[in-house]
């Protein structure tokens, strides 16, 4: 399993990101995702090995406190058809939930950009999650966030070479962020 975290981040204001969900295996957080509708979550395909039964926790800020949150089972797993384990290409997956999310102040879906809509270089963006706070360190039970800036694709390709795909990825830089 790929280990991801929010490095050099700060704790998010509770419930300020109501679209964020915790994807869990045996009630242990393994990945983050976000609601894109009342019954679909978007996440990374590497979060599921093809056999596990995952659940999604919506409405959470602190994973040790179930107040205002709901646990929902996953009805179906829809990884990108070209995703291959151990490769970063096409690492995206939809989860169809067993029941619709009860939308409220703690659980709302996020708006997705329209097709062809680009994010300008140097745009300030945020990343969020419950991952590790430092490399190989402990995971946070509280939602963390960090600000990053969008990087120029040419600069990113120069730095990452064949590991970067302009059509599938975006590069960011900053003092904190999501690290693999």
Spans of model-derived segments:
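Extracellular/luminal ectodomains of metazoan preproproteins built from arrays
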Residues: 1-15, 101-105, 110, 118-123, ...
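Extracellular trypsin-like serine protease catalytic domains
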Residues: 3-7, 20-26, 123-180
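Conserved catalytic-core segment of clan PA serine endopeptidases
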Residues: 7, 57-102, 115, 161-162
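Acidic glycine-/aspartate-rich tracts in secreted/extracellular proteins
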Residues: 46-50, 60-64, 98-103, 131-134, ...
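Short edge-strand/loop segments of extracellular domains
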Residues: 55-65, 111-117, 147-153
């Amino acid at each position: 399993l790929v280990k991801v975290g929010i490095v050099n981040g700060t704790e998010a204001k509770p419930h300020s990101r109501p679209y964020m969900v915790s994807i869990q295996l045996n009630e242990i957080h393994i990945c983050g995702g976000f609601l894109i509708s009342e019954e679909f979550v978007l996440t990374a395909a590497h979060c599921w090995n093809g056999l596990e039964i995952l659940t999604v926790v919506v409405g959470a800020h602190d994973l040790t406190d179930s107040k205002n949150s709901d646990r929902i089972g996953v009805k179906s797993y829809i990884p990108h058809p070209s995703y291959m384990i151990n490769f970063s290409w096409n690492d995206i997956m939809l989860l169809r939930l067993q029941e619709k999310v009860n939308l409220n102040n703690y659980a709302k879906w996020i708006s997705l950009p329209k097709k062809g809509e680009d994010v300008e270089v140097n745009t300030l963006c945020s990343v969020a999650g419950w991952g590790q706070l430092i490399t190989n360190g402990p995971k946070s039970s509280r939602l963390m966030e960090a600000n990053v800036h969008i990087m120029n694709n040419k600069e990113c390709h120069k730095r990452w070479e064949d590991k970067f795909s302009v059509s599938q990825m975006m590069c960011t830089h900053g003092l904190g962020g999501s690290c693999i």
